């Protein structure tokens, strides 16, 4: 009897642990609706994507959505679409740049908090077809992604401060609010999302703006179930619901309650979690939408961020704000292409990998795939690293990934000591070939020196 009681207690403990580490799916209202495993695996294998924040607001060079009623008066902001004519937009050029930069998927802001739609929507006139440009941006990008083998994802804001039925106002908007109209807005939102899925077939939907009180946990779970009925292998981020781990670092109290397939830390590198899918979204400059002369992150910073994110178990969604005329800034394009050159030599340590097994340190992070462990060196002029090696794991050889040059190492007890040639070019990757399936290794704590 005592054994049975102990077994029951252990079962409850591990079931709660499993619910935490595997947080994903339709939430408590849809207990049998789980994340599509194959689609999630593809998403995680991609590891690196491009985020694109774009719309008429770029004509003013201020932030998308948030500047409505603040930096730009509401009436002026809402009329910007009448001037929006990005005649130099070339979907093929965008996607070829993304692909050459090593990015495996895109996410485009089809509708931000300002409510403007970048596609030809039959449910509103506040869209791209009402601009002087009169061409479907989303359609062109979807076609280009298919042409060049890049996964196509869409951003869609739940918050819509322009729509009369959305039951929250922002930026001093004087229009009255009627909470009873929110149900009409939800219908509008579902109609638009069905339109986007039917017409453009995205692999993922990246929600945002669900934090306001007029949008509820129940609405989030219902919307998730609705979308998965429309497309069973759709991947949906956690911002569809109310339990996000995002900008405010709000932690899940009961993660299994909430809908969503992966977590979305914003403008920060997520914590080391290799059993919970997550994606850091971060800007290449300071602002999400284009801003003239915005401060831009350099190549080293960008590559270090990529290594740290993937070494922690996450994806990196790196944001570019296209200019009003439809082009990427040359300096941003050049930097992204330089990232692509690094990935041409080191991508094996990024794509289709799992974070770990070594817990991240200031000097390095690690990724793994097959029988190999990849050590991403983050510190300049590092000359030596000592690593504990799990029992029964044998080291066959160690090389620098980019050129295949051997790295001298010594084995002492259950540790290996790597002797590195000092380098000022970081990150660089050391490939450790073992005799075991490295993805099965447990996390090795930071008792390294």
Model-found features: residue ranges?
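Mature catalytic domains of secreted/periplasmic carbohydrate-active enzymes
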Residues: 22-449
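Bacterial Sec-dependent N-terminal signal peptides
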Residues: 1-24
């Amino acid at each position: 009897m005592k054994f049975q009681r102990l077994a029951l207690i252990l079962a409850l403990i591990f079931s709660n642990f499993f619910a935490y580490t595997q947080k994903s799916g339709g939430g408590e209202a849809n207990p049998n609706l789980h994340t599509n495993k194959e689609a999630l695996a593809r998403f995680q294998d991609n590891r690196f994507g491009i985020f694109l924040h774009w719309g008429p607001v770029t004509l003013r060079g201020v932030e998308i959505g948030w500047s409505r009623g603040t930096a730009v008066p509401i009436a002026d902001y809402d009329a910007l679409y009448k001037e929006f004519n990005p005649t130099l937009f070339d979907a093929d050029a965008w996607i070829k740049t993304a692909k050459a930069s090593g990015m495996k998927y895109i996410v485009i802001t089809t509708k931000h908090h300002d409510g403007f739609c970048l596609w030809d929507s039959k449910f509103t006139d506040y869209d791209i077809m009402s601009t002087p440009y009169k061409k479907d941006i989303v359609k062109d990008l979807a076609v280009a992604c298919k042409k060049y083998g890049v996964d196509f994802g869409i951003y869609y804001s739940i918050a819509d401060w322009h729509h009369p039925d959305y039951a929250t106002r922002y930026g001093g908007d004087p229009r009255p609010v009627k909470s009873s109209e929110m149900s009409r807005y939800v219908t509008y939102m579902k109609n638009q999302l069905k339109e986007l899925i039917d017409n453009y077939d995205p692999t993922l939907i990246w929600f945002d703006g669900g934090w306001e009180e007029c949008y509820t946990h129940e609405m989030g779970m219902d919307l998730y179930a609705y979308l998965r009925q429309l497309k069973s292998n759709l991947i949906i981020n956690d911002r569809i619901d109310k339990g996000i781990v995002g900008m405010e670092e709000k932690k899940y109290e009961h993660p299994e309650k909430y809908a969503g397939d992966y977590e979305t830390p914003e403008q920060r590198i997520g914590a080391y979690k290799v059993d919970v899918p997550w994606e850091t979204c971060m800007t290449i400059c300071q602002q999400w939408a284009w801003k003239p002369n915005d401060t831009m992150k350099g190549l080293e910073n960008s590559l270090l961020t990529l290594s740290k994110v993937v070494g922690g178990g996450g994806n990196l969604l790196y944001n570019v704000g296209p200019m009003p005329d439809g082009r990427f800034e040359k300096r941003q394009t050049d930097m992204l292409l330089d990232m692509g050159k690094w990935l041409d030599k080191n991508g094996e340590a990024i794509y289709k990998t799992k974070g770990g097994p070594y817990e991240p340190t200031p000097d390095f992070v690690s990724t793994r795939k097959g029988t190999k462990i990849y050590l991403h060196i983050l510190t300049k002029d590092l000359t030596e690293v000592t690593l504990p090696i799990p029992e029964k794991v044998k080291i066959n050889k160690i090389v620098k990934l980019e050129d295949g040059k051997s790295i001298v190492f010594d084995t002492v007890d259950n540790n290996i000591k790597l002797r590195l040639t000092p380098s000022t070019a970081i990150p660089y990757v050391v490939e450790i070939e073992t005799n075991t399936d490295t993805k099965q290794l447990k996390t090795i704590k930071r008792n390294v020196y």
